Amino acid sequence: MPNMSPTKVPMPQQDPNVRNKNFEEVATGYTAEMAMEEATRCINCKNRPCMTGCPVNVPIPGFIEQVAAGNFEKAYEIITSENALPAICGRVCPQENQCEGKCIRGIKGESVSIGRLERFVADYHMAHGAKAELNIEKNGKRVAVVGSGPAGITCAGELAKKGYDVTIFEALHKAGGVLSYGIPEFRLPKSLAAKELELSLIHI
């Protein structure tokens, strides 16, 4: 039975007296128990308006259902079928205007915390999951992508799924574009962005 609480499970954060002395991430993320509790707030509605608000068409009800059941690796598999950067998107996408902005639960309360759940799943995979083994038949063609910002990485990932051997060329010292150079550490840790780029299995 869905959890009909009108409010989201609160996001744990650093104490203000601690975070005013460092540049570490302010929001510390859900525990497994918190994520499962929040996931039960999804009523798996028939029309799935949350998906119409997602620019990359992540199967949101499907991955949330797996989180509620404690199947975190299956949830990761579902998310990454459409989105190669869930840890990053779970932190910096404007969910309040996209998926969460369309959530039915938001009509009489707070929407399901889709972004926080996506972040939890990605962080869980980074901590516990095995490195992905892609069984994709190569088509023998090579593609170069210029620029390793979010658009370049996404393009490369989609091409790789279709069997292309993709190499990204980047002029700067670090890959990621705005992910590495434009977002402050307390919002998106540089080490996390680098780790997610590594998991994307794209040559840069």
Residue ranges: model-predicted function:
Residues 84, 149-151, 174:
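Residue-level detector of alpha-helix initiation sites
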Residues 1-142:
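Ferredoxin-type iron-sulfur electron-transfer modules and their immediate structural context
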Residues 202-204:
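Conserved small/polar residues in nucleotide/adenosyl-binding loops
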Residues 174-192:
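Conserved N-terminal glycine-rich FAD pyrophosphate-binding loop of Rossmann-like flavoproteins
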